[in-house]
UniProtKB/Swiss-Prot annotation:
Tissue specificity: Adult and fetal liver, intestine and peritoneal macrophages.
Similarity remark: Belongs to the apolipoprotein C2 family.
One GO MF term: lipid binding
Record protein name field: Apolipoprotein C-II
Phylogenetic classification of the source organism: Eukaryota, Metazoa, Chordata, Craniata, Vertebrata
Pfam families recorded: Apo-CII (PF05355)
Signal peptide as annotated in the record: 1-22
Known role: Component of chylomicrons, very low-density lipoproteins (VLDL), low-density lipoproteins (LDL), and high-density lipoproteins (HDL) in plasma. Plays an important role in lipoprotein metabolism as an activator of lipoprotein lipase.
Amino acid sequence: MGSRFFLALFLVILMLGNEVQGNQEDDSGSLALLGTVQGSLLSYWTSAKEVAKDLYQKTYPISMDEKLRDMYSKSSAAMSTYAGIFTDQLLTLLRGE
């Protein structure tokens, strides 16, 4: 998300810089260069997004799913153990033994 902010800020500064310069001669070479730079930045951003998305989809379901299942089984086993101990203590207290 930070990269999007910096890219947007860069484009806003670029547009403000063009407004400050006023109506000077439009050099078709500079416009072509600007279009090329914008196109390459957009293609780089799109490819980086796709690579990150693919990497996330490859790594998340395998490792994170196993870790979450393991944490759930360990925590539910611990909770059932402590619930049993609490129940035994409560019954002993109520019976008065």
